[in-house]
């Protein structure tokens, strides 16, 4: 209640930790609501800065609540559509967190209705949305920086195949680490992350 700590799924915390955020880093979280990764990043970048964004204004309130509750002074929150490129942020970020819209099949244990609602057509549409957002996200990363891609799903199309496609299109990036968590095998949500390193100029 006093904001000394917060509870977060292990998989999400592992993803943010794997990004290697340093105390002085500038971090962009481009699909941030409800703000768990934003606040975790802000804890790592205590002398740095986190720009936290989401397209849904009503969800920004959740981020604000979490930031205020944890008494974090290094976070700015903005309403922003991640499919729209922000020229002013080009090559500015040390780390970009791209936890993107997905089919959510990794959290069926908490939301059982997902398995009845998700269709192949929806997954195909989400894959293209993810691809579009990644094209913007990768341009915000400065040389030597990191792009963290993550989803709370388990499909190869949204995870490993998405990253393979990205790397073919962007030779300036290399895969540093990737990990797939599975419910029933790991003691956490189904979740995927890939840490992508941008080569120096």
Language-model regions, residue ranges each:
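S-adenosylmethionine
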Residues: 1-201
């Amino acid at each position: 209640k006093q904001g000394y700590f917060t509870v977060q799924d292990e998989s999400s915390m592992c993803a943010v930790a794997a990004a290697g955020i340093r105390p002085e880093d500038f971090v962009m979280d481009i699909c941030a609501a409800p703000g768990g990764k934003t606040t975790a990043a802000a804890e790592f970048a205590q002398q740095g800065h986190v720009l936290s964004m989401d397209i849904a204004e009503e969800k920004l309130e959740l981020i604000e609540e979490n930031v205020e509750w944890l008494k974090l002074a290094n976070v700015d929150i903005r309403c922003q559509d991640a499919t729209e490129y922000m020229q002013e942020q080009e090559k500015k970020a040390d780390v970009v967190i791209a936890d993107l819209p997905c089919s959510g099949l990794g959290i069926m244990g908490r939301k059982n209705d997902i398995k009845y609602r998700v269709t192949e057509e929806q997954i195909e549409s989400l894959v293209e949305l993810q691809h579009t957002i990644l094209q913007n996200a990768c341009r915000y990363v400065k040389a030597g920086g990191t792009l963290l891609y993550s989803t709370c799903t388990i499909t190869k199309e949204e995870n490993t195949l998405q990253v393979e496609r990205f790397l073919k299109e962007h030779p300036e990036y290399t895969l540093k680490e990737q990990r797939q968590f599975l419910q029933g095998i790991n003691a956490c949500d189904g979740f995927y992350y890939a840490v992508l390193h941008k080569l120096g100029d």
